[in-house]
């Protein structure tokens, strides 16, 4: 089974990816990891990408697509894959479609984990970190015994700058602007499976598998 997964920051996508690849016995392809491996490993594609990155430029779509194509051609993808983090734009989706067609690969479904914005804000802005030992808490889901104080070492808990409401809203704005056209694109192809991510983790997994006939 060949799948693509989308989901907002704080939507629980990472957790679901782990379960899906285990349940479906397919390979998880995180394009972020793939990118880093190519650059770190000094592959031909990685070296080309590094040139753009060192110059402070965006890596061209055709180079990213070439990396994805190379990754999909590996033996561990023969039983199927879960593509995570790509495409991010409609032109990338079109390029991916053309690549899959060239390779004789059919995309079975596109999974979209949807969570109301208010819930995402609660999840993402509630994190607190200890200044001393780095332990992580959450004001709603894993609150410290004493407000603002680390259970483990008694250190001060603080909110990281990228967890503030303004920063989180900015990230969600970018995500929504990128993803909405993709939702429409895959919806027109009849591939889109919308999953309610505002549920218990196990129920989200159940719904994801049910949408795939499992």
Swiss-Prot record:
E.C. numbers: 2.7.4.3
Question: Where in the sequence is the signal peptide annotated?
Answer: none
Extract the SUPFAM superfamilies matched here.
P-loop containing nucleoside triphosphate hydrolases
> Which parts of the sequence bind ATP?
10-15, 127, 136-137, 199
GO BP field: AMP salvage
Q: GO CC terms for this protein? A: cytoplasm
Q: Which domain of life is it from?
A: Bacteria
> Where is region (NMP) located?
30-59
Pathway it acts in? Purine metabolism; AMP biosynthesis via salvage pathway; AMP from ADP: step 1/1
Quote the record's binding site residues for Zn(2+): 130, 133, 150, 153
- SS bond list: none
Q: Provide the protein's localization.
A: Cytoplasm
Q: Name one GO molecular function term.
A: zinc ion binding
Which keywords appear in this protein's UniProt record, sorted alphabetically?
A: ATP-binding, Cytoplasm, Kinase, Metal-binding, Nucleotide biosynthesis, Nucleotide-binding, Transferase, Zinc
**Primary enzyme class:** transferase
Stretches the record annotates as LID: 126-163
Q: Which NCBIfam families match?
A: adk (TIGR01351), PRK00279.1-2 (NF001380), PRK00279.1-3 (NF001381), PRK14527.1 (NF011100)
Its job: Catalyzes the reversible transfer of the terminal phosphate group between ATP and AMP. Plays an important role in cellular energy homeostasis and in adenine nucleotide metabolism.
Summary of subunit composition and partner proteins: Monomer.
Q: Which family does it belong to?
A: Belongs to the adenylate kinase family.
Q: How is this protein named in the record?
A: Adenylate kinase
Q: What is the lineage of its organism?
A: Bacteria, Bacillati, Bacillota, Clostridia, Thermoanaerobacterales
């Amino acid at each position: 089974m060949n799948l693509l997964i989308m989901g907002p920051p704080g939507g629980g996508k990472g957790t679901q990816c782990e379960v899906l690849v285990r349940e479906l016995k397919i390979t998880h392809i995180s394009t972020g990891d793939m990118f880093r491996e190519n650059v770190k490993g000094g592959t031909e594609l990685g070296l080309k990408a590094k040139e753009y990155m060192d110059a402070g430029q965006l890596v061209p779509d055709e180079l990213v697509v070439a990396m994805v194509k190379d990754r999909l051609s590996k033996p561990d993808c023969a039983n199927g894959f879960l593509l995570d983090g790509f495409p991010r734009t409609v032109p990338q989706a079109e390029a991916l479609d053309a690549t899959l067609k060239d390779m004789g690969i059919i995309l079975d479904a596109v999974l979209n984990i949807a969570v109301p914005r208010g819930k995402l804000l609660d999840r993402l802005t509630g994190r607190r970190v200890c200044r001393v030992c780095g332990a992580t808490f959450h004001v709603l889901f894993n609150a410290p015994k004493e407000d603002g104080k680390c259970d483990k070492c008694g250190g001060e808990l603080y909110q990281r700058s990228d967890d503030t409401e303004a920063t989180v809203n900015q990230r969600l704005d970018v995500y929504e602007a990128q993803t909405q056209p993709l939702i429409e694109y895959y919806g027109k192809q009849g591939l889109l499976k919308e999953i309610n991510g505002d549920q218990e983790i196990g129920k989200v997994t159940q719904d994801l598998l049910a949408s795939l006939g499992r």
